[in-house]
Amino acid sequence: MILFFIAGSQVMSQIPSGYKGTPYKDSVYQTGAQNIPGRIELAFYDFGGEGIAYHDTDTANNGSLLNRSEGHCRPGISESICFFRENEGVDISYTKDWADFNHPNKTDPKVNQLYIGWQEDGEWTNYTVDIKVKGRYRIVTIYGNHDNGSTLWLNHTKLTDIKLPEDTGNWHYWTQATVAETTIEKTGLNLLTLKYNSGANLAYLDFILIEAID
């Protein structure tokens, strides 16, 4: 077990020895490890690059490539959204007026919500998370399209399957759903891995505490 000091507080680390990734942070979106309970924004995967913080089957960020096309970086939208993490391989885009809000959604995503798309079988992303409470958790996400056989892993041990219960019929037709319930028996800094296959646009994972445990 390793102790870290974050913002003056001592935090235990359960992160596997030898992991070289570090929590995502920049001046706009995020400062350090994401918290559980709380929302894990999937675009905020760790720094560290291919094979460490993520695995993608090609080197291009296909979301940024698309958003370089005419009409895809919408008027008034900052480049920090249109071309988020443009030089990395994970494929990230954002919700747009003419693609995501020009039809009824069962649940509307946030305007300019970043999401991971263009997924291929065997890809994954890593997240340094700070687990505040041991307990039973409900996991909720907002997604478009259909189930893609995702799984969540904690410190290289499988935590749960992620089951997207409904086929929305389109990558840009969004709904929100409970996709798993699981028990987390660790606190402090931990390594959360999302492994996914082709089939869905995924925006975030909300970890909602059902019941704390000792």
List each model region and its residues.
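Bacterial Sec-dependent N-terminal signal peptides
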Residues: 1-14
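Extracytoplasmic
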Residues: 14-214
